[in-house]
Amino acid sequence: MSGGGTETPVACEAAQGGGGKKRDSLGTAGAAHLIIKDLGEIHSRLLDHRPVTQGEIRYFVKEFEEKRGLRELRVLENLKNMIQETNERMLPKCRETMQGGLEETLQRLQAATDSIHRLQQREQERKKVINDHLTASEKQRMLQWEEFLRGQPQRRAEVDAEHRKAMERLREQYAAMEKDLAKFSTF
């Protein structure tokens, strides 16, 4: 199968076993070598497809690049047309729409900002009035408390004096009652 005519008779001679002992051992080794060589060739022809696949790959790459090149050219042309259309038609429309919407949005935002600013001023004024009122009330209460504390010793002295007078009257009353009782106990 290797393509040479001498290989087959050698293999046959080895299979027939013709010849001397020395020749048999040499023939068997040579025949085995030839058989291995034939098996290698069979293997490469049946199972090794590198040359065929390389040719197919080259063909596929060539076809792919040709078709791909045309397809990419069409895609790039379409993209160019879309970009031109966008620049000429869509972009000005978008700018106009954006500017119109942006102006309206800015006006609303300014109105909302002014409204919030007024609300904050009112709230600050209200807090200031409340704080001023609280501060004035606190000062007034502090003055009242100080006046109350200043008048406290005098009131205490008055209460103590009244208490002493009441105690003195009670003593006199009890003393008078004791005298009256002493008069009645003699009976």
UniProtKB/Swiss-Prot annotation:
It comes from the Eukaryota. The modification N-acetylserine is found at S2. GO terms for biological process: anterograde axonal transport; anterograde synaptic vesicle transport; developmental pigmentation; endosome to melanosome transport; melanosome transport; neuron projection development; otolith morphogenesis; positive regulation of pigment cell differentiation. The keyword rRNA-binding does not apply. GO terms for cellular component: axon cytoplasm; BLOC-1 complex; microvesicle; transport vesicle. Coiled coil: none annotated. The keyword Acetylation applies. Pfam families: Muted. Residues 1-27 are annotated as: Disordered. Component of the BLOC-1 complex, a complex that is required for normal biogenesis of lysosome-related organelles (LRO), such as platelet dense granules and melanosomes. In concert with the AP-3 complex, the BLOC-1 complex is required to target membrane protein cargos into vesicles assembled at cell bodies for delivery into neurites and nerve terminals. The BLOC-1 complex, in association with SNARE proteins, is also proposed to be involved in neurite extension. Plays a role in intracellular vesicle trafficking. Belongs to the BLOC1S5 family. Octamer composed of one copy each BLOC1S1, BLOC1S2, BLOC1S3, BLOC1S4, BLOC1S5, BLOC1S6, DTNBP1/BLOC1S7 and SNAPIN/BLOC1S8. The BLOC-1 complex associates with the AP-3 protein complex and membrane protein cargos. Interacts with BLOC1S4, BLOC1S6, DTNBP1/BLOC1S7 and PI4K2A. Component of the biogenesis of lysosome-related organelles complex 1 (BLOC-1) composed of BLOC1S1, BLOC1S2, BLOC1S3, BLOC1S4, BLOC1S5, BLOC1S6, DTNBP1/BLOC1S7 and SNAPIN/BLOC1S8. This is Biogenesis of lysosome-related organelles complex 1 subunit 5. The lineage of its organism: Eukaryota, Metazoa, Chordata, Craniata, Vertebrata. The gene is Bloc1s5.
